[in-house]
Amino acid sequence: MSELSVVALGHVHTESIEPLTAHLTRLEQVMTNLAPRVSLVDVRAELNRAVDAAAHDWILILREREFVDAALAAEIAASMKTADAWGFRIRVAPLYAGKELRVGVDPGELRLFHRRHLLRRGEVGVQGTVVRLRNAIHARTFDSPEEHRAYLAMNAVPHSSLRRALLFLSRARTFDANTLRYLWIEAGYDQQ
């Protein structure tokens, strides 16, 4: 019997976890009042309460704008059944305009764990083995460059052309056109 509780940070849509339903007998979503981008260390008490309120032993932490695809759903279900470890690190792959961004290496975060092995203080961790899953959680950033520019125009201060070019050149470490477009737009603004 495969049962999973999803602890949601922010508003997580049902479509974000729908691929899990094909592999699980029961799926529960535990809503929290936590901000989507908050550090889990800073809200340990609230996270512990959410884990205690969950009905199932296996817990998945998902943030707003993140979603599980079919490959990750199958890997999560298989990992829960084999129980090779009590915790699983999962990378987050940001999507920009529908394509994956290549901005640095993400070692992953402990996002899937068995509640009885959760350490209740400090960094999020489990007592026992932690394994990194192959597939990643996907996170939507902006659906288009126009949406990205509009957001920055409202919430950030523009840079000069020279500063923008210098920032872009210092951060550009890829030849992926989608990632370069993202970095060029980001370099144009100073976010508060």
Task: Walk through the language-model features, giving the residues of each.
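N-proximal low-complexity "stem/linker" segments adjacent to membrane-targeting elements
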Residues: 1-32
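Local beta-strand N-terminus motif with an aromatic residue
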Residues: 2-4, 56, 85
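A generic local structural motif
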Residues: 17-20, 45-48, 74
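A short beta-strand-loop structural module common to alpha/beta enzyme folds
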Residues: 30-40
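Active-site nucleotide-sugar/metal-binding loop of Leloir-type enzymes
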Residues: 44-58
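Catalytic-site signature of metal-activated, phosphate-bearing donor transferases
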Residues: 48-51, 69-192
